[in-house]
Amino acid sequence: MRFRHKAAALAATLALPLAGLVGLASPAQAATSATATFAKTSDWGTGFGGSWTVKNTGTTSLSSWTVEWDFPTGTKVTSAWDATVTNSGDHWTAKNVGWNGTLAPGASVSFGFNGSGPGSPSNCKLNGGSCDGTSVPGDAAPSAPGTPTASNITDTSVKLSWSAATDDKGVKNYDVLRDGAKVATVTGTTYTDNGLTKGTAYSYSVKARDTADQTGPASGAVKVTTTGGGDGGNPGTGAEVKMGYFTNWGVYGRNYHVKNLVTSGSADKITHINYAFGNVQGGKCTIGDSYADYDKAYTADQSVDGVADTWDQPLRGNFNQLRKLKAKYPNIKILYSFGGWTWSGGFPDAVKNPAAFAKSCHDLVEDPRWADVFDGIDLDWEYPNACGLSCDETSAPNAFSSMMKAMRAEFGQDYLITAAVTADGSDGGKIDAADYGEASKYIDWYNVMTYDFFGAWAKNGPTAPHSPLTAYDGIPQQGFNTADAMAKFKSKGVPADKLLIGIGFYGRGWTGVTQSAPGGTATGPATGTYEAGIEDYKVLKNSCPATGTIAGTAYAHCGSNWWSYDTPATIKSKMDWAEQQGLGGAFFWEFSGDTANGDWWRHRQRPQVTPAVRTTRRH
């Protein structure tokens, strides 16, 4: 799909408050409490504007203030106002000037600066105390508790025990962390975690909190696998998998966040999420959007668990919200998807050394900051030995299978490895261009992109459904339908239960159309909310309801506009067909296109459906 990937995400970022406000509260003096709040006020690419606000939250006057913080190497203050700002290397100090040092209770003052570089402040102190309110000068945080031991392990529960932490003022309680996210706070040194999934691996650690509400470092981690279970997540016949791709750029203009999976009810029904996208460049897997992925701060009302991010926590953004989602729904497994329509141009260089490429992907997926978030990897190369946004003219015929073989060797058998693949079933088309049959030995399943067969990139038409299940009289291109694509994959030796059918939460359309049935002429793409020629299902179901069906999908003629999209009824017919064919299930693109109450999920008819969110693209 021609969604706005990096460029659009950045543009949307610039249109929003880039950093938001991150509260950094701290008792600044024994008798006077104060908070320091940082905000990035602007960003022009090579530099940014920032401000700090100091507020007296205590009951007595504050006579002076000093704010300290660290910037990463390469980020610095270039000019400042309303404070005296100095630095020693990467450590920066701002002190009040003569007129703004005294703050009455409830009063606040701000100072600003311009900076260069991409970094954000860390290790903040206000008048010697920590800016997040967890310490006061002269008061030490508690020590780390002992590494927990696990006992009484069942299909759904485990008992944890640990040795006590020490503190100069006494320990108040302990936070129990499952896979990095807090699941309980207890006053003793034991805890039984219930409601787990059988045959599933978890990691537990503990943090102590003292009577001054300071939190100490985490204990060592103990790994626990519940009893029971099956084959570790491989879908087999597909009856188990209910997957969805979540897009990192959706947090901008679409305002769709991980918490929406909870409020829509989708999280109650899915088993897998593909997180899209990481980039492929320089022969390596790389981060796609660092701000959305792990830096964006979430307020309490935006957060999955209702707890706001702090300015100095080691992981924020979507990755941390996904971690919280897994804590709330421990059955959900998450895969990191790399490439996509926009970022597939790096694959030809990467597969020149498949082992090195696979290692780079493993190192990124298993980065210690988020190693507990991801359970596998999805590769979305569009397309090996063929053309997508760019053309692959250098890869060997076996490049795709060599890549997947290297991925399996690097990640091992305990990780899920999947791939998004073309649905071009035409003679000599994209399926014929790569060795998908050989590669299927190393993957858990293929997400076959059975949509975007036709669209308004052919601005004058003919109008045609973008996701036909079968061929029909007058179809513009033979082989551009789901049935032909699946038949061709099977002929290449791909097992049917490793093939997932793709369905979009959107429609494609033209304007200037007078003919109701498919095959009409047009003058160009219809207007869409985010992109011409494409619109979310949640909009189309009301603005242009379906007026007919063809080849197992729906279409609508409204005024001069003509749209095609799937409805709950056509979804059911496709699921019936997929079951008859022995396919592994289905996936959907993408979560933000669904209604606020998860309309697709409420109408989902069969347990083998594998809803995923994929980017759509031309075949």
From Swiss-Prot:
- Which spans does this entry mark as compositional bias, Gly residues? 227-236
Query: Where in the numbering of this chain does the CBM2 domain appear?
Result: 31-134
Q: What is the similarity comment for this entry?
A: Belongs to the glycosyl hydrolase 18 family. Chitinase class II subfamily.
Tell me the segments the record calls region Disordered: 212-236
Question: What is the induction comment?
Answer: By chitin.
Among the GO molecular function terms of this UniProt record, one is: polysaccharide binding
Q: Which residues bind chitin?
A: 312-313, 339-342, 383, 449-452, 589
* Source organism of this protein record: Streptomyces lividans
By its UniProt entry, which PANTHER family does this protein fall under? CHITINASE (PTHR11177), CHITINASE 12-RELATED (PTHR11177:SF317)
* Catalysed reaction equations from the record: Random endo-hydrolysis of N-acetyl-beta-D-glucosaminide (1->4)-beta-linkages in chitin and chitodextrins
Matching entries from SMART domains are given as:
CBD_II, FN3, Glyco_18
State the name under which the record lists this protein. Chitinase C
Q: What range(s) does the GH18 domain occupy?
A: 240-619
Domain Fibronectin type-III, by residue range, is 144-229
| Active-site residues, Swiss-Prot/TrEMBL | 382 (proton donor)
Q: Could you tell me the keywords of this UniProt record?
A: Carbohydrate metabolism, Chitin degradation, Chitin-binding, Glycosidase, Hydrolase, Polysaccharide degradation, Signal
